Design a protein with these regions (language model features):
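Transmembrane alpha-helical segments in integral membrane proteins
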Residues: 98-119
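Transmembrane alpha-helical segments of integral membrane proteins
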Residues: 138-149
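Non-cytosolic membrane-interface motifs at loop->transmembrane helix junctions
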Residues: 151-162
Length: 187
């Protein structure tokens, strides 16, 4: 159990660090299209005016909830707007701490699964198992967005690469820290 907990903390830290490289540095700009400063300010004002009263949420624009909305969706342009009503600090320390805690919990769940199903497997086999599950899950959840919901391929491909590499780093750590078949009884 101590190795599982230590591996989860260190694996979560590895996952968080990879995520930070992708999303907390200028590298993250690869995921986004840029608009001119004047257009950005005008869009922000329009968001505040039209979405501010209804609050934080995800908005499909135009809304396909009516016949007229469905016709507008068919004509385009369309957007899925992830709207936050309040300002945020960049970097947001609260989000960084919350993200680290989430990463540790996710690696703990993966470690429990590995320990339950692959306790007698070698490090290489456990690592392969994590990579295969990470690839399958992130392919569906990340790249499923452009496939099913017509979201932008560039952003979600970048997200997929960051998620897959985060899980690869975390998987290597947790697979290493779980007791090896040769060391059973020494935990």
């Amino acid at each position: 159990m101590p190795r599982l907990l230590i591996g989860s903390v260190l694996g979560g830290l590895a996952m968080w660090l990879v995520g930070f490289v992708f999303w907390g540095t200028p590298l993250s700009l690869l995921a986004y299209k840029q608009v001119a400063a004047g257009d950005s300010a005008a869009l922000q004002a329009a968001l505040a005016q039209h979405l501010g009263p209804t609050g934080t949420g995800a908005y499909w624009i135009p809304s396909p909830g009516s016949a007229a909305g469905t016709e507008l969706v068919g004509r385009g342009p369309n957007a899925l707007v992830q709207f936050v009503n309040s300002g945020i600090a960049l970097p947001d320390t609260g989000a960084l701490i919350g993200g680290l805690i989430l990463a540790i919990l996710c690696v703990l769940v993966a470690g429990i699964a590995l320990r339950s199903c692959a306790a007698r497997a070698s490090f290489a086999d456990r690592f392969k198992l994590v990579l295969l599950f990470a690839a399958a899950i992130t392919l569906y959840t990340d790249l499923g967005q452009p496939v099913f919901n017509h979201m932008p391929w560039g952003y979600f491909t970048y997200l997929w690469v960051s998620d897959l590499l985060s899980w690869a780093a975390a998987g290597a750590v947790i697979a290493w820290f779980l007791p090896h078949p040769r060391s059973e009884g020494r935990e």
